[in-house]
UniProtKB/Swiss-Prot annotation:
The species this protein was found in: Bombyx mori
Identification of the protein by name: Unknown protein 20 from 2D-PAGE
């Protein structure tokens, strides 16, 4: 579950905060 959660959360974070780039 974490393995899928991690990338999913990261992708969402980039879309919501592209400046972060993280």
């Amino acid at each position: 579950v974490i393995g899928v959660x991690v990338p999913l959360f990261k992708g969402k974070s980039q879309l919501l905060d592209p400046t972060x780039x993280g």
